Amino acid sequence: MDPEETSVYLDYYYATSPNPDIRETHSHVPYTSVFLPVFYTAVFLTGVLGNLVLMGALHFKPGSRRLIDIFIINLAASDFIFLVTLPLWVDKEASLGLWRTGSFLCKGSSYMISVNMHCSVFLLTCMSVDRYLAIVCPVVSRKFRRTDCAYVVCASIWFISCLLGLPTLLSRELTLIDDKPYCAEKKATPLKLIWSLVALIFTFFVPLLSIVTCYCCIARKLCAHYQQSGKHNKKLKKSIKIIFIVVAAFLVSWLPFNTSKLLAIVSGLQQERYFPSAILQLGMEVSGPLAFANSCVNPFIYYIFDSYIRRAIVHCLCPCLKNYDFGSSTETSDSHLTKALSTFIHAEDFTRRRKRSVSL
C-alpha cells in the first residue's frame, strides 16, 4: 500500500492522526522502546489485579449494595477489558512500532480501546451526576436514584460506547510501510475530521464540563451546609479533598491527550497548519501513556479514600478480618451527608414557610 494513503498510529489511543505527513516510524521521545514496555507491563499487572479484586469485592460483598457501586463495577469492567489489550501494545513498543500480531488484533484492540474510552467518560459523568443528586438534591432525587435505573443507565452506556467504537473497525488497518507492518489509521478525509471533532466534543469536553459543574455545585453545597451547621473543619476538608482528587485524576489522565487530539484535528481541517506535525506527534506520545494509566489507578483511589470499598476488599482477601473496624470518616458513599443535608433542606423549607406565614 502507498504510504501516502495511511498515517501510522502514533497517538497510542483511539484517535485519528489527521496529518498524512505524520508517518515517522520512530518516536520523538527518547528511550520509549525501553520505558514504555516496562511502564505498560506495570500498568497491566497492577490494573488487572486491582480491577479484578475491586469487582470481586463489590460483587460478592454480602448485604445491600450502594447505588454508586454499580457504576464502579462497570467502570472497573471497562478498564479490565482495555487492560487485556495492553500486552499487544507492549509488543508494539518493544518492536519499535511494528505491529506483529495481525490485522484482526489491530482492529480489535483499537475497537476495545475506543469502547473503554467512551465508557469510562460516560460512567464518570453518571457517577458525578449521582453524587450531585445525592448531595445537592437528596429529597427530590429519591425517585431517580434507584438500582433498576442504575442498571438501565449502565446498559445504555455500554450500548452507546460499542456503537461509537464501530468507526474504528472501518478506519483501522494493518498496512505495510517499507515492507514493515504497522497498525495504521487510513488517511483522514475532511468528512472524517469533522466527525472526529464532533465526536470529541460530545464524548469528552461536554462530559468534562458536566463533571466539573457537578462537583462545583457539590463543593458549594457542602460549604453552605458546614457553615450553617458550624462543623466545617475535618469533615469539610475530607469531603472536598475526595472530590478534587477524583476530578484531578480524571483531568490529569484525559485532558492532555484529548487536547492534543483536538489540536491535531483542527490542524488537519485548516489549509495552513499552525501546529507542526512533530509537535502534535510529541503531544500524543507524551499524553497517551497517561490515558493508559488511568485504567489502573481507580482501584487504588477508591481503596485509599473510600472506607466502604476498603472494608469490602480486605474482607474479600482476608475474611478473618471481618470484624476489624476500618472507620468511616472518609467514606464516599455520602450516606451521612445525604441524611444531614436532607435534614438541613427540610429545616430551610420550614424556616422559609414560617417567615412567609409571619409576613402575611
From Swiss-Prot:
Question: Gene3D superfamilies recorded for this chain?
Answer: Rhodopsin 7-helix transmembrane proteins (1.20.1070.10)
| Residue ranges, Extracellular side | 1-33, 91-120, 171-192, 261-284
Q: Is Phosphoprotein included in the keywords of this UniProt record?
A: yes
* Post-translational modification, as annotated: Phosphorylation is necessary for YWHAE binding and efficient surface expression.
Which Pfam family, giving just one, matches this sequence?
A: 7tm_1
Main location per the UniProt record: membrane
Q: How does it sit in the membrane?
A: Multi-pass membrane protein
Subcellular localization is given as: Cell membrane
- UniProt topological domain (Cytoplasmic) ranges: 55-69, 142-149, 214-239, 306-360
Phosphoserine modification sites are S359
Which regions form coiled coils? none
Q: Which GO terms describe its cellular component?
A: external side of plasma membrane; plasma membrane
Q: Which GO terms describe its biological process?
A: angiogenesis; calcium-mediated signaling; cell chemotaxis; G protein-coupled receptor signaling pathway; immune response; positive regulation of cytosolic calcium ion concentration
A single MF term (Gene Ontology): C-C chemokine receptor activity
Which keywords, in A-to-Z order, does the entry hold? Answer: Cell membrane, G-protein coupled receptor, Membrane, Phosphoprotein, Receptor, Transducer, Transmembrane, Transmembrane helix
Q: Which InterPro entries does the entry mention?
A: CCR1-9-like (IPR050119), GPCR_Rhodpsn (IPR000276), GPCR_Rhodpsn_7TM (IPR017452)
Task: List the SUPFAM superfamilies.
Answer: Family A G protein-coupled receptor-like
Q: Which domain of life is it from?
A: Eukaryota
What does this chain do? G protein-coupled receptor that plays an important role in immune homeostasis. Acts via its natural ligand GPR15LG, a chemokine-like polypeptide strongly expressed in gastrointestinal tissues. GPR15-GPR15LG signaling axis regulates intestinal homeostasis and inflammation through the migration of immune cells. Controls thereby the specific homing of T-cells, particularly FOXP3+ regulatory T-cells (Tregs), to the large intestine lamina propria. Also required for skin localization of thymus-derived dendritic epidermal T-cells.
Self-association and partners? Interacts with adapter YWHAE; this interaction promotes ER-to-Golgi transport of GPR15.
Q: Which family does it belong to?
A: Belongs to the G-protein coupled receptor 1 family.
Q: What is the protein's given name?
A: G-protein coupled receptor 15
